[in-house]
C-alpha cells in the first residue's frame, strides 16, 4: 500500500490489538496539515479561527512549513491579505489569536506537540509529577515516566522518543523562543481523589458543563478519561 496523499510507503502499526495503516513519510502533506490543526486546537495551543482549510492554503503558498512558523505570520501580512477570505480585520484577528496563545499551560503545550498516545489528561499527569518543569520532562528516561501512576511503557517510550529526535529538538528550540508557560498556582485543594480515574457522562445537575466538572476532579488529584476501561474507578 502507498499513502494516497503523498505516495509514500505505509506500514501497519499494531497497538493493543488495533491495527492502523500509517504513512512512514515524515514530510507527508496530509500528516503536516493534521499536525498543524492539532497544534492550534482548543485543548492544545487554542489559536482561534484557524480552520484546516485556512491552514492548507497557508501551507500551499509556503507560509507554513513547521508549526513554529505560525509565530512568524505577522511578518507576512501582504501574502496573508492575498489569500481568499482574508481582509484587514480577519488578518488582525488571526495575529491577536496567535499572540493570545503564547502563554499556554505546560500540559496543553505538551499535548499540542502530537506525541503518539499522549492525550491531555496524560500530559497533565506528567506535568504534575515533574512539578511543571519542562526541562525535567525533556531529559527524563522511560523509567521516570513509568514511575507515574497510569503512565505505561507505550506512552513512556513515545515521550522519550519524541524528545530525543533531532528534528523535534529543533522544533522545540524554535517554539520556546515564542512561548512562555503559564505559571501554575500550587493547588490548595486537598488531593482526596489522587489515583482515582473517572469518566464523565450523562447530564449534570450541579455543574454548568462537563469541562467544569472535569477541572474540579483534576484539582482534587483525580484523572478524567474519555472512555471506560478496566482502570476506571467511577463513571
Segments the model singles out, each with a brief description of its role:
Residues 1-48:
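Cys/His-rich short segments
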Residues 6, 17-19, 54, 194, ...:
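A generic structural signal for well-ordered coil/turn residues at beta-strand boundaries
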Residues 12-25, 79-94:
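Membrane-interacting alpha-helical segments
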Residues 32, 39, 84-235:
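DNA strand-break repair and replication-stress modules
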Residues 48-56, 64-82, 147:
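Compact, charge-rich alpha-helical regulatory domains located at protein termini
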Residues 56-59, 95:
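Short, well-ordered alpha-helical packing segments
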Amino acid at each position: 500500500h502507498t499513502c494516497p496523499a503523498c505516495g509514500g510507503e505505509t506500514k501497519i502499526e499494531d497497538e493493543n490489538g488495533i491495527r492502523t495503516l500509517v504513512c512512514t513519510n515524515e514530510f507527508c502533506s496530509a500528516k503536516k496539515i493534521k499536525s498543524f490543526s492539532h497544534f492550534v486546537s482548543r485543548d492544545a495551543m487554542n489559536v482561534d479561527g484557524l480552520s484546516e482549510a485556512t491552514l492548507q492554503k497557508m501551507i500551499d503558498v509556503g507560509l507554513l512549513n513547521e508549526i513554529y512558523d505560525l509565530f512568524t505570520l505577522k511578518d507576512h501580512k501582504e501574502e496573508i491579505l492575498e489569500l481568499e477570505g482574508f481582509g484587514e480585520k480577519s488578518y488582525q484577528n488571526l495575529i491577536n489569536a496567535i499572540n493570545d496563545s503564547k502563554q499556554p499551560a505546560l500540559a496543553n503545550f505538551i499535548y499540542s506537540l502530537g506525541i503518539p498516545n499522549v492525550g491531555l489528561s496524560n500530559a497533565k499527569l506528567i506535568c504534575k509529577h515533574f512539578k511543571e518543569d519542562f526541562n525535567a520532562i525533556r531529559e527524563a528516561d522511560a523509567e521516570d515516566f513509568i514511575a507515574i501512576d497510569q503512565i505505561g511503557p507505550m506512552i513512556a517510550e513515545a515521550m522519550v522518543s519524541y524528545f530525543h529526535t533531532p528534528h523535534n529538538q529543533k522544533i522545540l528550540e524554535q517554539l520556546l523562543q515564542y512561548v512562555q508557560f503559564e505559571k501554575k498556582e500550587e493547588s490548595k485543594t486537598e488531593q482526596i481523589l489522587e489515583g482515582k480515574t473517572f469518566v464523565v457522562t450523562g447530564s449534570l445537575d450541579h455543574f454548568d458543563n462537563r469541562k467544569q466538572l472535569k477541572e474540579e476532579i483534576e484539582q482534587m488529584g483525580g484523572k478524567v478519561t474519555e472512555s471506560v476501561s478496566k482502570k476506571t474507578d467511577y463513571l
